[in-house]
């Protein structure tokens, strides 16, 4: 077994770390494979961090949900635009893209929420708010 330490990148959206890939460097724009967020890489004293590339914009949430759906193989239905509108409203009111169908505004409910990232779509066919759907 190798003693080489694998660098990991901290994602401020899903609060998880993912593996640093060869060819990436400070300033690289990468997509978190866990939540789909576009991140700009930054090296800190504690390791690698991804800063949100388009924080607070409609582009940020649209890119995130599109990337997440592509990564997981999910699809959207006709309520997508209503949910994006709800996510924008949550950002304006509470400071982040919290699930518009949940009353709690905590980090684990940033879209895509932790239950969705944890397999709700696979188990139930869709996420809590109906944004992400399992392909049939």
Regions found by a protein language model. Name each.
Residues 11-14, 32-35:
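Short cysteine-rich clusters marking metal-coordination/redox-active sites
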Residues 1-10, 19-24, 28, 38-85:
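Short, intrinsically disordered terminal segments enriched in charged and Pro/Gly residues
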Residues 56-136:
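Long, distal/terminal scaffolding or interaction modules
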Residues 24, 35, 105-107:
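Short loop/turn positions at the edges of beta-strands in beta-sheet-rich folds
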Residues 30, 38-39, 51, 118-120, ...:
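Short, low-complexity, polar/charged sequence segments that are solvent-exposed and flexible
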Residues 20-31, 116-124:
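Short linker/helix segments within small regulatory modules
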């Amino acid at each position: 077994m190798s003693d080489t330490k694998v660098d990991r990148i901290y994602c401020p959206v899903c609060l998880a770390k993912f593996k640093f890939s060869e060819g990436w460097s400070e300033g690289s724009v990468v997509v978190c494979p866990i939540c789909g967020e576009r991140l700009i890489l930054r090296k800190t004293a504690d390791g690698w961090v991804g800063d949100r590339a388009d924080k607070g914009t409609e582009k940020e949430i649209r890119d995130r949900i599109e990337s997440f759906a592509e990564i997981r193989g999910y699809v959207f239905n006709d309520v997508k635009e209503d949910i994006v509108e709800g996510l924008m409203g949550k950002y304006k009111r509470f400071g982040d893209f919290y699930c518009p169908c949940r009353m709690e505004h905590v980090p684990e409910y940033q879209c895509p929420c932790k239950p969705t990232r944890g397999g709700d779509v696979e188990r139930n066919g869709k996420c809590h708010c109906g944004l992400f759907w399992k392909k049939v």
